[in-house]
């Protein structure tokens, strides 16, 4: 994965191809690769665009939809959009969509893999498989060894959604190193409010 910037272009080409809505100055888009595909993450180029889907809602019933704290737990770093782009473009770890599959199948951030938060809540073969994907080892004495665990970045629907915080807290309880976990609090809502690219994942049946 790599960050892609506008480089030396002719003035005429620049006029034709320039993004009028950039991510940051000099960065019109980011290209990322996953599963043999290249995705171009950029912002919607129409400045008068606004959300019309479920993420346009300002309020949801509580419980269960309370506002989550900025720090999901002490010792775990909270990311914004630029940090997410840096993480996925430089392949710094595993990017996890912690939402239930029905949410993930509708729309997701490019390169994310779906590991629903419920996977980590009980001792099941599915949880064991997920933890091994993340680099954990199950020891002979019945505990998990996270020495080789991968760095993970988790997200869900937004600051009002508890799915990724629930997954993070479950991983902490299992002994997953806090230093190897990151939390994108803004999630799908903030991502879409900024007009960033989403995809409809190819869900394996």
Regions found by a protein language model. Give the residues of each.
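Solvent-exposed loop/turn segments at secondary-structure junctions
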Residues: 100-104, 119-121, 158-162, 187-191
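Catalytic cysteine-centered active loop of the rhodanese-like fold, especially the PTP/DSP P-loop
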Residues: 135-189
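Hydrophobic h-region of N-terminal signal peptides that target proteins for export
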Residues: 9-18
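Positively charged, proline/Ser/Thr-rich regional signature most characteristic
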Residues: 72-150, 201
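Sec-dependent signal peptide recognition
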Residues: 2-9
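Flexible, polar/low-complexity N-terminal or interdomain linker segments that lie immediately upstream
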Residues: 17-106
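Short, solvent-exposed loop/turn and secondary-structure capping segments
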Residues: 106-110, 127, 164-168, 194-195
């Amino acid at each position: 994965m790599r960050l892609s910037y506008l480089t030396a272009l002719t003035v005429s080409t620049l006029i034709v191809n320039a993004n009028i809505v950039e991510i940051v100055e000099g960065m019109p888009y980011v290209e990322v690769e996953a599963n043999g595909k290249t995705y171009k993450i950029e912002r919607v180029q129409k400045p008068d665009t606004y959300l019309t889907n479920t993420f346009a809602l300002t309020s949801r019933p509580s419980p269960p939809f309370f506002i989550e704290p900025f720090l999901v737990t002490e010792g775990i770093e909270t990311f914004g959009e630029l940090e997410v782009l840096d993480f996925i473009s430089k392949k710094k770890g595993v990017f996890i969509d912690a939402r239930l599959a029905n949410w993930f199948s509708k729309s997701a951030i490019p390169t994310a893999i779906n590991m629903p938060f419920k996977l980590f809540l009980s001792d099941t073969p599915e949880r064991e498989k997920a933890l091994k994907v993340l680099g954990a080892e199950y020891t002979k004495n019945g505990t998990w060894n996270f020495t080789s665990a991968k760095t993970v970045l988790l997200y869900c629907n937004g600051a009002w959604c508890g799915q990724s915080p629930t997954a993070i807290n479950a991983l902490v309880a299992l002994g997953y190193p806090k230093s190897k976990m990151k939390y994108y609090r803004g999630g799908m809502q903030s991502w879409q409010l900024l007009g960033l690219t989403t995809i409809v994942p190819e869900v394996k049946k």
